[in-house]
A protein has these predicted regions:
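Active-site rim beta-loop-alpha module in soluble metabolic enzymes
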Residues: 147-204
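Metabolite-binding pocket within alpha/beta catalytic cores that recognizes anionic/polar moieties
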Residues: 2-159, 198
Length: 204
């Protein structure tokens, strides 16, 4: 993960009557996708969740799920778990994409929240301990120097608008740049600047 100079995190809306802005479907099942279990544990404890010993995921995968109910919501926190050979957290865009897809298939959530620590840039207004909602995400390390493929590689996408969260929680908003390297090479830095990013992570 990137150094904890900011956080790409959010909170569950307290009222069970929360409604999805996408299709006005009432929100009842929420999945948090969090790359590292140490990042997830504060929420696991906050929501008093239980680890799923009879996994809903395919046999043999290291993915970990914590589940329970909180104020009328079915809460799930899913982590990629530990690499079987090396014992480290399965960070990066590939493992997080797989576990997110599997969570959608198995849990049918109404809302998915990708949360965790990230690096932030002071020149863009980020400070240690800030909580950001991502307004847009893009890659900074998918370099394909062919017309049109270069745009595909950057993969810039706008995030869902969450005006109620912004208003109620008074969070900061910024563009997020993601990639599979913790360090920041000069070429990555140039791409991050081009992405106009305030926040940098490894799992967006």
């Amino acid at each position: 993960m990137a150094p904890p100079h900011g956080e790409k995190s959010t909170e569950v809306k307290e009222e069970p009557s929360a409604v999805s802005s996408v299709d006005n479907r009432p929100i009842s099942t929420i999945v948090f996708i969090i790359a590292m279990q140490t990042e997830a544990l504060p929420l696991v404890n906050k929501f008093q969740l239980t680890e799923d010993v009879d996994s809903v995921f395919p046999k043999g995968v290291p993915w970990v799920r914590f589940y329970g109910n909180y104020k009328g919501f079915a809460i799930n926190i899913v982590c990629p778990g530990k690499d079987p050979a090396l014992g480290v957290d399965g960070v990066g865009t590939v493992s997080i994409s797989l576990v997110t897809y599997a969570s959608v298939q198995a849990l049918k959530p109404d809302l998915i929240i990708n949360a965790g620590t990230a690096g932030g840039f002071g020149a863009k207004g980020a400070s240690i301990g800030d909580v950001f909602l991502s307004s847009e995400v893009a890659f900074h390390d998918r370099r394909i120097p062919i017309p049109v493929f270069d745009i595909y590689g950057v993969g810039s996408r706008k995030a869902f608008a969450t005006p109620n969260l912004l208003k109620e929680l008074n969070l900061k908003v910024g563009k997020l740049s993601t990639g599979d390297s913790l360090d920041m090479s000069p070429v990555d830095e140039a791409a991050i600047v081009a992405n106009d990013a305030t926040v940098k992570d490894m799992e967006a």
